[in-house]
């Protein structure tokens, strides 16, 4: 996923001309503006930024993957819109893997409750895996324990909820090798 936040639509178009089709945006309004400017229906847009519950109607069903599902409140807001339009939305649950107050994401100990809620009450949301941003930004190997912890959490959910959860979204340019290793 190429992160295109703060880059103009012309840059997205240029990168897409080289074969890149997956683009990640942090802000709903910026993503929608670029999508409207570009006549490129084959692009796959990812929402990688925090989504407030009140913005759920603008997100629901508009992205190939929502990387930042982080609360029961947001899952309910998404489900309401998805149900009214009879469409689905694939999502990753964002886990606050470092337990940092300033970061978004569900705390690891609350993760099973969120999964249980989505499975029981949000039939239009399809859980595909987990996402995290480690507390050490672009720190190479120092991020690896956080990636390992996310993988273990995913493995526990697979076992306890009988879910495939094939995706782990973790790592950026400075630590992606360690994310892949996990």
Where are the language model's segments positioned?
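Conserved alpha/beta-domain cores
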Residues: 1-174
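Non-catalytic positions within long, well-ordered alpha-helices that form the structural scaffold/packing
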Residues: 16, 180-181
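Hydrophobic residues within well-ordered alpha-helices
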Residues: 59, 179-180
